[in-house]
């Protein structure tokens, strides 16, 4: 086999490894008709129909806590956190439990959509006014929906 072909194959393999390193899975969800995504590496589980215990003297967006197998987890309502009006809960509302740098937190969302593969090199800087929660955005290939990327590290620093 000529050396030129081997070099080409090696270059293609390196490019594939580089491209794979930039790809990440994201769990997408809707809140107030906005599509958000969170890196799947943070996701512990998705909970439906779990009772919340409210807490006094907390911001409105902290809906309360849950006891999940003996662990107390604070729950943040993303809708309220981004300044949207509160909504009635229905059967599609669920809690996504996240583990961010060893801290578990739950986010209350309108509905979970799907898992998508994202090329993180294609993420653009967020133009959203409340950048405390959004670190970037990307146009998805499934019809042009724009996904806002949730900045988990910033979110837990405020709880």
Describe the predicted segments one by one.
Residues 1-159:
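An acidic, low-aromatic, low-complexity terminal/linker signal
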């Amino acid at each position: 086999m000529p050396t030129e072909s081997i070099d080409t194959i090696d270059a293609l393999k390196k490019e594939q490894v580089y491209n794979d390193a930039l790809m990440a899975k994201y769990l997408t969800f809707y809140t107030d008709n906005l599509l958000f995504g969170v890196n799947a590496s943070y996701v512990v589980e998705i909970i439906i129909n779990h009772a919340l215990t409210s807490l006094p003297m907390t911001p409105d967006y902290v809906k309360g806590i849950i006891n999940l197998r003996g662990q107390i987890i604070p729950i943040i309502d993303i809708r309220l956190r981004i300044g949207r009006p509160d909504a009635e809960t229905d059967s599609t509302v669920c809690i996504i439990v996240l583990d961010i740098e060893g801290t578990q937190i739950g986010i209350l969302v309108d509905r979970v959509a799907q898992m998508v593969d994202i090329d993180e090199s294609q993420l653009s800087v967020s133009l959203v006014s409340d950048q405390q929660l959004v670190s970037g955005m990307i146009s998805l290939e499934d019809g042009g929906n724009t996904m806002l990327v949730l900045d988990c590290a910033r979110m837990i620093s405020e709880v």
